[in-house]
């Protein structure tokens, strides 16, 4: 497994792979890898000749400096996991390598609408940071496919739109959420939970599933469903942050023509902001 930290070396390797006619898959990450990331790697390996995993804690997508400062940096452990998975190349640049003149004056990519709604409304600048770094990685790695987790549902929708709008010749693969046996979606943020909070955490998925059951049973008073769900979360020990029921294909309000709904839930548990989602077919 090759570990590359600089842009010139990455470009050199990508040129070589292209000359050899290899099909390249990219898995963008911020490190602190868990089994959910490994599922992305496995999907990439099944679809391509060469797998490139990027590990970069992107300062542009953090709206709170304290969150950036405390995000775990576990490069050595991450590389050991990826080596066992027989990943071909790890791109682990420094912030200086990606943003040589800092982030304030760096050219950015913005996806109107999707970047400022829902999660974007509560995290200003977050999705602009995501679309900027992902587009830069696409330009550097020139992958044939790129794999993203469906846990970050809005992020996946945003990247799909960016790829379509910008004309990137890249297949975007959404990989289903990987869950612990008790239903909790795997996430790097789970590491912020205490042992006691970890016992409470599966309650998020239970509330999510309860909303899904109501929708499948034909209930359509969304305001009431959301209000009850928020109360249930708070009673379980969470601080409900945002609960939305949207059209799964547009992320707009559910309408009579909507065929699928996506339930998007975000809640605080201690210092961890947990997110999850579930898609429901509407009769």
Swiss-Prot record:
It is found in: Cytoplasm. Beta-alanine binds at residue 61. GO terms for biological process: pantothenate biosynthetic process. GO terms for molecular function: ATP binding; pantoate-beta-alanine ligase activity. This is Pantothenate synthetase. Homodimer. It comes from Shigella boydii serotype 18 (strain CDC 3083-94 / BS512). Its EC number is 6.3.2.1. ATP binds at residues 30-37, 149-152, 186-189. Pathway: Cofactor biosynthesis; (R)-pantothenate biosynthesis; (R)-pantothenate from (R)-pantoate and beta-alanine: step 1/1. It catalyses: (R)-pantoate + beta-alanine + ATP = (R)-pantothenate + AMP + diphosphate + H(+). The reaction proceeds by a bi uni uni bi ping pong mechanism. (R)-pantoate binds at residues 61, 155. Pfam families: Pantoate_ligase (PF02569). Belongs to the pantothenate synthetase family. The active site is at 37 (proton donor). The gene is panC. The keyword Nucleotide-binding applies. Keywords: ATP-binding, Cytoplasm, Ligase, Nucleotide-binding, Pantothenate biosynthesis. It is an enzyme of class 6 (ligase). PANTHER family: CYTIDYLATE KINASE/PANTOATE-BETA-ALANINE LIGASE, PANTOATE--BETA-ALANINE LIGASE. Its main location: cytoplasm. One of its GO terms (cellular component) is cytosol. NCBIfam families: cyt_tran_rel, panC. Catalyzes the condensation of pantoate with beta-alanine in an ATP-dependent reaction via a pantoyl-adenylate intermediate. The keyword ATP-binding applies. CDD domains: PanC.
């Amino acid at each position: 497994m090759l570990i590359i930290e600089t842009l010139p070396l990455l470009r050199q390797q990508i040129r070589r792979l292209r000359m050899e006619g290899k099909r390249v898959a990219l898995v963008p990450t911020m490190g602190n890898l868990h089994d959910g990331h490994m599922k992305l790697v496995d999907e990439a390996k099944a679809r391509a000749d060469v797998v490139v995993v990027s590990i970069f804690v992107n300062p542009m997508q953090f709206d709170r400096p304290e969150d950036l400062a405390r995000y775990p940096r576990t490069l050595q452990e991450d590389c050991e996991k990826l080596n066992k998975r027989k990943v071909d190349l790890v791109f682990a640049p420094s912030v200086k390598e990606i943003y040589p003149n800092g982030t304030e004056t760096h050219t950015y990519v913005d996806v109107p609408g999707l970047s400022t709604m829902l999660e974007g409304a509560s995290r200003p600048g977050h999705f602009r940071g995501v679309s900027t770094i992902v587009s830069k990685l696409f330009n550097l790695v020139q992958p044939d496919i790129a794999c993203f987790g469906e846990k970050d549902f809005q992020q996946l929708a945003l990247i799909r739109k960016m790829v379509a709008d910008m004309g990137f010749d890249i297949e975007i693969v959404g990989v289903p959420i990987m869950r612990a046996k008790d239903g909790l979606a795997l996430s790097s943020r789970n590491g912020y939970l205490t042992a006691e909070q970890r016992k409470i955490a599966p309650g998020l998925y239970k509330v999510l599933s309860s909303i899904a059951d109501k929708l499948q049973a034909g209930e359509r008073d969304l305001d009431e469903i959301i209000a009850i769900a928020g109360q249930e979360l708070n009673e379980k020990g969470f601080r409900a942050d945002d609960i939305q029921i949207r059209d799964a294909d547009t992320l707009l309000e559910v309408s009579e023509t909507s065929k699928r709904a996506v339930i998007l839930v975000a809640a605080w548990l201690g210092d961890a902001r947990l997110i999850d989602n579930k898609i429901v077919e509407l009769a």
